[in-house]
Amino acid sequence: MTADNAIFIPPYKADDQDVVVELHNRFGAEAFVAQETRTGMPVLWVKRAQLKEVLSFLRGVSKPYSMLYDLHGVDERLRTQRRGLPAADFSVFYHLLSVERNSDVMIKVSLSEGDLNLPTVTGIWPNANWYEREVWDMFGIDFAGHPHLSRIMMPPTWEGHPLRKDYPARATEFDPYSLTLAKQQLEEESARFNPEAWGMKRQGANEDYMFLNLGPNHPSAHGAFRIVLQLDGEEIVDCVPDIGYHHRGAEKMAERQSWHSFIPYTDRIDYLGGVMNNLPYVLAVEKLAGIQVPQKVDVIRIMLAEFFRITSHLLFLGTYIQDVGAMTPVFFTFTDRQRAYTVIEAITGFRLHPAWYRIGGVAHDLPRGWEKLVKDFVEWLPKRLDEYTKAALQNSILKGRTIGVAAYNTKEALEWGTTGAGLRATGCDFDLRKARPYSGYENFEFEVPLAHNGDAYDRCMVRVEEMRQSIRIIDQCLRNMPEGPYKADHPLTTPPPKERTLQHIETLITHFLQVSWGPVMPANESFQMIEATKGINSYYLTSDGGTMSYRTRIRTPSYPHLQQIPSVIKGSMVADLIAYLGSIDFVMADVDR
């Protein structure tokens, strides 16, 4: 993308109603039911008969909603706080994002239990494919016309739909598990790849195709990830990514944890992102509760989040270069990560999974001596990045393996839901820290690194430059750390300030209930997205006025990034796929949740 055709991104305006006016003008106001939420976007319910027409209109409107950011479902049957909403046993939501407008809109449709089907929208947004499969997998909602509606998170032999409210949430609610020989053989046979089921031929006009399983146990697959390759020699004719091996039911877990006790579970999504995982969750809960955190909390959160951006990118850099054949850099990047973890551990008490952010603040104040630790790191890392750039990134073999490999443009990136460095490597200047500042990022000076070829090499270079910008942000946190409390003065802050419990019996009772049962959040919906280490990560929370989330939707960046693989890599060599997989920068917990 050149400067001549770069997308202009206007200033962000929450709850932008311009699209609502356009929809009313096109379909009539009576076609929609507006829902008041704290999501920061218009939320409109439509009838199933008009769903596809409405979505097609939004896809083709001036400054279109080019990205289907998310698509998922909700079991509405046990929800009590639904005043003013259409009757529904289940609902499906379509979260659309327009970079050109810098705004979002959410379209919802209600379904009755005896008629759980919708038309597919894979012809409008290609990345709807996996999302619709997951909705069928988790809720049993059918999508007519879908090219391959099958399990995606659960094994093919699984029975039931886990995110339904009548599906057990605990293993103890099932019969004891036993693996008989017959069951083992059934599971093994179900994992066998059938090319015809995916529309693939075993033979061409003059050749036989070979089908190769890469993974789910392969070092270049970066986790429990299987991709089946249809090969003509070493050329990739087609491929089928197969995910779900790392699925742990994170969204189901959120329905049986209190708002506070779910925080450690967020750390396990992108397990390299540390407190970066906590941030969208606690910000979304704070929106529900109406909590405004002190400025010091914002700055502390940003500083720690940028530390984890650096540690994640260092791991990416080492393993990426290793994937294309150089062994030495990975040892250096792992050693350098330890310098960052020394600072992180001194501040939070933990390394990879601190679970350190809290509803309304952070776990505790900064320790004595934190300034020197941060200052030493800020002064040291830029020199190391210079060494990596000179010794590794300018290496002719690395360039030969990655320049021009697995390239795509901005239009393709948006259609597949690609965000983060993968999007900015195409020249699209969309970084939420700038485009939609949260947690005080608007108070910091930094640049958004861009590239223009959208290939494997550019994705690497963007992340290296992002580390330099993270150092700038951390340095500003160091120099401008505000005084004040590390926790908000709000009744729903969790855990509440200890000093309030030492007054009389009523404060002790309140403290006990809030810590043991958890805070009661107002009935509403909230949403928060952030620029995480691997792209845009978000939490969409539904509260029914209780101590636990009614529905927690976790949208992760790695999920659509893997879905994009076949469209990018067809016609390339197997060696190019290895370079491409490394350049994506994903972890399977971020994909499978």
From Swiss-Prot:
GO cellular component: NADH dehydrogenase complex; plasma membrane
Taxonomic superkingdom: Bacteria
Role of this protein: NDH-1 shuttles electrons from NADH, via FMN and iron-sulfur (Fe-S) centers, to quinones in the respiratory chain. The immediate electron acceptor for the enzyme in this species is believed to be ubiquinone. Couples the redox reaction to proton translocation (for every two electrons transferred, four hydrogen ions are translocated across the cytoplasmic membrane), and thus conserves the redox energy in a proton gradient.
Keyword annotations: Cell inner membrane, Cell membrane, Membrane, Multifunctional enzyme, NAD, Quinone, Translocase, Transport, Ubiquinone
InterPro entries membership: NADH_DH_suC, NADH_DH_suCD, NADH_Q_OxRdtase_suD, NADH_quin_OxRdtase_su_C/D-like, NADH_UbQ_OxRdtase_30kDa_su, NADH_UbQ_OxRdtase_49kDa_CS, NDH1_su_D/H, NiFe-Hase_large
Species in which this protein is naturally found: Pseudomonas putida (strain W619)
Protein name per its UniProtKB record: NADH-quinone oxidoreductase subunit C/D
Keyword Transport attached: yes
Family per similarity comment: In the N-terminal section; belongs to the complex I 30 kDa subunit family.
Catalytic reactions on record: a quinone + NADH + 5 H(+)(in) = a quinol + NAD(+) + 4 H(+)(out)
Binding partners and assembly: NDH-1 is composed of 13 different subunits. Subunits NuoB, CD, E, F, and G constitute the peripheral sector of the complex.
Keyword Metal-binding: no
Localization in the cell: Cell inner membrane
Primary location group: membrane
EC numbers for this chain: 7.1.1.-
Pfam family, one: Complex1_30kDa
